[in-house]
Amino acid sequence: AAEKLFISQPSLSANVKRVEHHIGYPIFDRSTKPLSLTECGVQYIKAVEKIKSIQNEFEGFANDWGDLKKGTLTLGGSNLFSSWILPPLIADFARRYPLIQISLVEETTANLARMLRHGQLDLMLDSSVLDATIYSCRKFQEEHLILAVPGAFPINNTLRSYQLPVEDILSKKFLEESCPPVPLTRFKSEPFIMLKPENDTGKRARMICQNNLFEPNIILEMDQQMTSYNITCSGMGISFIGDIMLSKVPLTSDVVYYKLPACESSRDIRFYWKNGRYQTRAMEEFLKM
């Protein structure tokens, strides 16, 4: 046996005695020739074989997991991100790593942050600034808020030189210095459709109005940016809409668009994960996309 294991007989005997001392019972019956296993020895060998099998199975899983042949990835986003931004990223990731099981959760920012903190999500995509003591983040892209005004509002007739052609929004030409922001105070008497104050867009929109020395006439408060835009399209009121969303949805001639002051309307869209959370290979590869 020692020769088959490529070790000396004394070394093999010492190892056997060490195991017997550890378990408290003899493995071999030394009164027989050749040596035979005791009842305890038989069970010990079976247990060792099971342990070795489990170890080999896990090593196989770890090798597959490292190559992204197994694993899960749970993503979260608000209505805007889960509807328009995350699906093409998920589709691309699934093409590259078809054996990874992907889940997408659509919720409010507050609920997504709670789920992320409790380990129910791997990553969330959002425009809000979350607590850096709890969450880590990576910038995905920059977004710019635009003023969306129902085309039937008479105020548009006095602001034609500030109106943004759709192609300038899609090409981001409106970000050039040659394109001036609209004087926002001209809209102080108009009705606004705002997102709720706890939403980053709602919070930022109110700040923009306050910085322009007026309180907006809010007739409706919504939870989702897409909903507020649809209400603007119906002609009810003015909304603040991100250029990312406008690049994804069908634009309509029933709405007129205006540039807002850059320093107030620009923000980062970020992927967030919980501080101290072990980053799986699936998370790492998704963040590289």
Where are these regions (language model features)?
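Short beta-strand-centered segments that line the small-molecule binding cleft or hinge
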Residues: 89-92, 110-166, 236, 256-258
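A late-sequence structural motif
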Residues: 85, 243-245, 254-289
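Hydrophobic hinge/microswitch elements
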Residues: 108, 112, 117-120, 127, ...
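Secondary-structure junction motif
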Residues: 155-157, 162-212, 279-280, 287
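A short LG(V/I)-centered, amphipathic sequence patch enriched
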Residues: 20-39, 59
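Residue cluster at the C-terminal edge of the helix-turn-helix DNA-binding motif
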Residues: 4, 17-26, 96
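Alpha-helical linker/hinge and terminal dimerization helices associated
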Residues: 22-23, 44-66, 286
